[in-house]
């Protein structure tokens, strides 16, 4: 079951919204959260609309790799939390980004030990709602290059003359992978500093977001 936090305010860039998310997660993590029964929460901090928060404790140190598949969308895969054979852990707390909006997504997380031996697979399916605010890609045109296209998970921002001032994410198939809401003012860039994202969310305000979307 994927849980949803009922926030008392809609503005994600307030300490109240962020504290509510942390409070709920802290409470829910107190249960026995194993790889067979992980905690799954939809976009707890409100910053990546189609993301899923994952929390579980394993019986031995492991690292995790994920794959997201959805009909008509590009398959997205990666290693969670910068994990590797040198970064195994017992406590697994991740934000899985980039599920395809309005489509049934199957998320598969594979866990490995420091010797790169497979130990466990966790799999679940969910259909994130389609956001009206997300601009549609009307046409996808194949280019002439014979070079293989790299894994696509792109951010689009910097609208000068548009009310659609959020940060939007797409894959190589032009399928929406969610959005990061902004407060009515476009951002020009996303900086990565010490593993955090830094971007403007209002005309005179910056957000610093960690790997959990907080």
Predicted regions and their residues:
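Histidine-/acidic-rich catalytic cores in large beta-rich domains
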Residues: 3-14, 38-53, 57-63, 91-92, ...
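Proline/serine/threonine-rich low-complexity linkers at boundaries of modular beta-sandwich domains
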Residues: 14-35
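Surface-exposed loop/edge segments in extracytoplasmic proteins
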Residues: 72-83, 118-120, 176-178
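A short, sequence-level motif marking secondary-structure junctions
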Residues: 82-84, 127-128
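Aromatic sugar-binding surface patches on proteins
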Residues: 85-93
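Surface-exposed, short loops/turns at beta-strand junctions within beta-sandwich domains
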Residues: 96-104
């Amino acid at each position: 079951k994927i849980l949803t936090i009922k926030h008392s305010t809609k503005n994600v860039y307030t300490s109240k919204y962020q504290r509510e998310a942390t409070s709920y997660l802290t409470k829910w993590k107190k249960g026995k959260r194993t790889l067979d029964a992980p905690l799954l929460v939809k976009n707890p901090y409100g910053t990546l609309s189609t993301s899923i928060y994952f929390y579980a404790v394993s019986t031995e140190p492991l690292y995790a790799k994920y794959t997201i598949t959805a009909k008509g969308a590009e398959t997205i895969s990666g290693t969670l939390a910068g994990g590797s054979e040198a970064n195994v852990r017992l406590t697994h707390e991740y934000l899985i980004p980039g599920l395809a909006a309005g489509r049934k997504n199957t998320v598969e997380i594979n866990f490995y030990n420091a010797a790169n031996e497979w130990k466990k697979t966790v799999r679940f399916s969910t259909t994130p709602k389609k956001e009206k605010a997300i601009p549609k890609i009307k046409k996808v045109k194949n280019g002439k290059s014979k070079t293989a296209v790299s894994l696509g998970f792109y951010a689009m921002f910097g609208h000068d003359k548009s009310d659609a001032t959020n940060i939007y994410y797409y894959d190589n198939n032009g399928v929406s992978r969610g959005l990061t809401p902004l407060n009515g003012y476009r951002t020009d860039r996303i900086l990565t500093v010490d593993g955090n994202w830094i971007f403007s969310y209002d005309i005179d305000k910056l957000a610093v977001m960690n790997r959990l979307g907080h």
